[in-house]
Every structure is written in structure tokens, then in C-alpha cells.
């Protein structure tokens, strides 16, 4: 689902409540350095109609106009959320936009959280890390525990290195949210149009090669929360199978039992600290 505006919503988020979205990528387009098999925005190749990124000035103007309107109407906002059509930290003015957003949040909705949904590929950059440290909810994605498995589910741009991501996330010292999508491919088949990258893909978040090493990453990083969810909308790859909340809880139960972190499962918090 491609966003058609820079500031959109608010919409109800199963994870964040009443969420006002900010899209730092092109309106009616998509730019991302991941090409996830489950992305609701579709494949990267289908979304590059407009390569013009919104400027910090446009984001500030659009956001202030929306916040004024919502405040006057008495509309609740729980989170101002950077998501949208791709990876928000790819916008070169991301640090300035974060500063502007925090100022406007404090002015109009001081109780709201500022959240950033990111694939964590640029956290190693000082300017990106410093900006993310300022927000309430830096929500960083790791879906799989090895470069080979990340290549299957996220199909990152060349140069991705999971170990570099992990080392960068350590700098948060636990003050971030780790996000993981759980799914499996149906019958181990990748059903896509002719010409798409690869011809077959087998991935299962419940397999030993995924679930055990993923929990080791959680133990290492000790995020303040592990947000575990599954697919909820149409996906560009056909034949993906969602997990039930019960399946996901069973998979992460060791982390809950150990009290490593709070685990949120598809919006239902299992607070077992």
C-alpha cells in the first residue's frame, strides 16, 4: 500500500495505538534498500515512479498543519510514526526532520511518542544514530539471524552486513525496540512473476536455523522490548503463511521465561520481566 501524502492518518496501529504517519520517501512511490518478500508496499521495482524526496521544510509544514488541525478537533495521537514507503533514514535530511518533529510534538501533543520504523541498515552512520537516540521509540528490524537468511526474507541492497547492524545496535545500550516479522513460505516454494530475482525460496521463522540464533541476538542486544508480529496484509510474494499469536508466543517463550526483555506479540504485550 503506497502512501499518497507525506503526513497521513492518524490510523490505528496494533502496536502503537493512534498513529500519525510521516512518509519521508516519494509520494506515490517507494525507495528502500530492502526488498522484503512481505512488504505491503510491494516490490521495489513497482514503486519508483517519483524519485523526489520530501524536504525537511515540506515535512515540517505538512506536519504542523496536520497537528494544528487534529489538536483543534480533539483527535488523540499516541504516536508520530516515521514509516511510509520504504526506509525513512534514506532521506538525507532525516536528522533535521527528527529535530523539527520533536519540537512540534512538544508544542501540540507533548504526551505523544515519536517512533521510527527502520531496517537498521544505516544505524552505523553517526548522524543517523544520533537522531534515532533522540526519539522515544527507535524500532529497529532484524527478521533473520544470518546474512544468508536475511537475503531470503529481506533481499537487501548489496553491502548489507548483519554483524555491522548488530554492532551498531549495541550502542543503544538496550534503549530501543527490536522488531521481527515471523512467517513461512508455503511448501517451500517462491511463487512470483517470471523474471523476479531467484526462482525458489524456503524460509520458516520457526525453523531451528532461525529461532535459536534469533533469540541469541535478543539476549546479546537486550532491547527494552522485542516486537514480534506476522503478516497482516497482502504481500508481493504469494504463498506466505502467517503465524498465529499462539505459535509466536511458543517460539519466544524462552526469552519471556528468562526475563530478558518485554515481548510484544501482535499487539498483545506479554510483560514477563
What are these regions (language model features)?
Residues 1-6:
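Short, Gly/Pro- and small/polar-rich lid/capping loops
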Residues 15-61:
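Canonical Radical SAM [4Fe-4S] cluster-binding loop centered on the CxxxCxxC motif
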Residues 22, 61-68, 97-104:
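Short, well-ordered amphipathic alpha-helices
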Residues 24, 82-84, 180, 230:
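Short glycine-centered, acidic/aromatic-flanked micro-motifs in structured strand/loop junctions
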Residues 61-83:
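Short Fe-S-cluster ligation motifs
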Residues 90-241:
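Conserved AdoMet/S-adenosylmethionine-binding subsite of the radical SAM
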Amino acid at each position: 500500500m503506497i502512501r499518497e501524502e507525506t503526513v497521513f492518518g492518524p490510523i490505528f496501529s496494533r502496536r502503537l495505538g493512534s498513529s500519525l504517519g510521516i512518509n519521508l520517501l516519494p509520494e506515490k512511490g517507494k525507495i528502500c534498500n530492502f526488498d522484503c518478500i512481505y512488504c505491503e508496499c510491494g516490490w521495489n521495482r513497482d514503486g519508483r515512479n517519483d524519485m523526489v524526496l520530501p524536504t525537511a521544510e515540506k515535512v515540517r509544514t505538512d506536519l504542523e498543519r496536520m497537528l494544528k488541525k487534529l489538536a483543534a478537533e480533539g483527535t488523540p495521537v499516541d504516536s508520530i510514526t516515521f514509516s511510509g514507503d520504504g526506509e525513512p533514514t534514506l532521506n538525507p535530511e532525516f536528522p533535521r526532520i527528527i529535530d523539527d518533529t520533536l519540537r512540534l510534538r512538544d508544542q501540540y501533543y507533548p504526551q505523544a511518542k515519536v517512533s521510527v520504523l527502520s531496517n537498521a541498515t544505516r544505524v552505523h552512520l553517526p548522524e543517523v544514530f544520533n537522531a534515532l537516540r533522540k526519539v522515544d521509540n527507535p524500532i529497529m528490524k532484524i527478521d533473520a539471524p544470518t546474512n544468508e537468511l536475511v537475503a531470503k526474507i529481506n533481499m537487501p541492497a548489496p553491502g548489507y552486513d548483519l554483524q555491522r547492524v548488530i554492532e551498531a545496535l549495541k550502542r543503544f545500550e538496550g534503549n530501543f525496540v527490536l522488531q521481527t516479522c515471523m512467517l513461512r513460505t508455503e511448501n517451500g516454494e517462491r511463487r512470483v512473476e517470471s523474471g523476479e530475482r531467484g526462482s525458489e525460496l524456503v524460509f520458516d521463522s520457526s525453523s531451528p536455523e532461525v529461532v535459536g540464533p534469533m533469540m541469541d541476538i535478543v539476549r546479546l542486544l537486550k532491547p527494552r522490548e522485542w516486537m514480534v508480529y506476522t503478516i497482516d496484509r497482502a504481500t508481493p510474494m504469494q504463498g506466505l503463511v502467517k503465524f498465529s499469536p499462539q505459535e509466536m508466543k511458543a517460539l519466544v517463550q524462552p526469552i519471556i521465561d528468562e526475563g530478558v526483555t518485554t515481548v510484544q506479540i501482535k499487539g498483545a504485550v506479554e510483560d514477563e520481566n
